[in-house]
Amino acid sequence: MLPVYKWWQVPYFWVGIKAYDFVAGSRNLKSSYFLSKKNALELFPMLKSESLKGAIVYYDGQHNDARMNIAIALSAARYGATVANHVAVVSLRKDPETGKLIGARLKDQMTNEEWDVQAKVIINATGPFTDSIRQMSDSTQRKICQPSIGVHIVLPGYYSPSSMGLLDPATSDGRVIFFLPWEKWTIAGTTDRSCEVTHHPSPTEQDIQFILNEIRHYLSGTIDVRRGDVMSAWAGIRPLVLDPSKPNTESIARNHIIDV
């Protein structure tokens, strides 16, 4: 649900959401539609009613990313791939005559055992660690990845209906924030700021307070949004394509790049 608090937003959001439906084509789950103020509040009772004009509802999907990753690994193993968890690339190996990459040296992070593997092709799909692997081949290569940290918080389930989420496409600093029902709880997020690459990113109190403040803008004034309602919080790192002309990560387009 996209709540609308100004009449000009109705055609603005409507055109964008209908374009979303059009791109989805025959795979679209259901067509989007407009809700009156009365119906929007019936579906999302905690929504702020002051100046509310109505809401636009569109359909999207959810999936459990952790389970999906496990399913991908198991499927790959079933078709003959060797799946090596907790294994890091220590260095890339080159043919001394041609300079062509021919393999890598790996390290088991649990036992510290190291060994070499040969490869005809090396695919670097390591997300925020992309540049560290690329520079193993050539330390002079320019960076193509801008790591950005995003934080989510988990709130009690009563913060959102069991079958309806809420999206705010324009927060106080131009980002997008959402509340989504998940496993009888409510997930709210996200933040977006540049960061250093780490294996264990963690949310800051500033990140959590930002999300809570944005939530307060869209919920009824009778709802006391408390810090104590945050049941848990986590952070992840997005590997955004580096654009030197963009000062902030929230202004960087979510593009993809293939570097051969």
Where are the predicted features?
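Core beta-strand elements of the Rossmann-like FAD/NAD(P) dinucleotide-binding domain
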Residues: M110-V121, A125
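C-terminal catalytic lobe of FAD-dependent flavoproteins
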Residues: R67, S75, S132-I187, R193-V260
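Helix-loop-beta segment of a Rossmann-like dinucleotide-binding subdomain
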Residues: D21, L41-Y79, G103-R105, E113-V117, ...
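General small-molecule cofactor/ligand-binding pocket signal
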Residues: T82-A84, M231
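Short aromatic/basic micro-patch
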Residues: F34, V83, D116
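A conserved short coil-to-beta-strand element within the FAD-binding core of flavoproteins
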Residues: N85-I102
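Dinucleotide-binding Rossmann-like beta1-alpha1 core, especially the glycine-rich loop
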Residues: M1-L43, I177
